[in-house]
């Protein structure tokens, strides 16, 4: 009898110890996530889950936490052009978020996060489905913009433009979303759809609304002016006077202001600032320069002259960027 009692006590102690270990790993994982030590957090979340003794709610908490860490790591992989690693990490995140949604299908935050990972993995249809489900729970302009980005990426330009228009008309307010940004996003979709007059109107509105809040951003204004000019040029409009006026607000001797000097014929292509010695920064500069030079050639009717720089943009631009998307659309149009 005593022997059976000792065995029972030992079993209780073992179970209690396992439960304590699982709970301790979960708390440690959350602490590691707070500190920004992603690898450690993933390991601890995994240990907590494999212990097999977490409550149902704690399992969901661990899945959410690990999924978010996988997503964060995937962005680092993308930054270093490790595309396969980025996709694998997002696949892991999607699996964790899917487990959470199996238990709580109305978790809008997780629907959005899974949608973002689907989008980054070029799986646009499931991304759109997740954003649509999230919109039924929370009709937010920022979610509309995220769905618009996925629609735009798959070539559904009309639907993307409609989502941006709905975001502009929404009575809801997102603290981290500016109206000028919505005009920009709609402008990009219109540009991709070859609706250049409409794109120019939206880029112009974005410039008007956003200039004061982005005054300290030395990159924002030159790029904004570049997109506005290209939309005008592709629409067959002569915007020289406006471009000359805007050029006075940027340093045309320093990148990316040199783009404006190039468009005005004040700077030759070979004289534009060379690529940065910093890898990612240099690729980003070459990406933008190649695309804008190609678009400028298209605006002047020089399709053959445009082909090589746009091909180069498609090669060097990160696959998650708008520039990569625009380059692909232009190359497809050149086939016709």
Model-found features: residue ranges?
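Helix-start (N-cap) detector for alpha-helical repeat units in TPR-like alpha-solenoids
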Residues: 22, 56, 60, 108-109, ...
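Residue-level recognition of tetratricopeptide repeat
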Residues: 30, 68, 75, 116, ...
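Short coil turns that delineate tetratricopeptide repeat
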Residues: 53, 57, 105, 138-139, ...
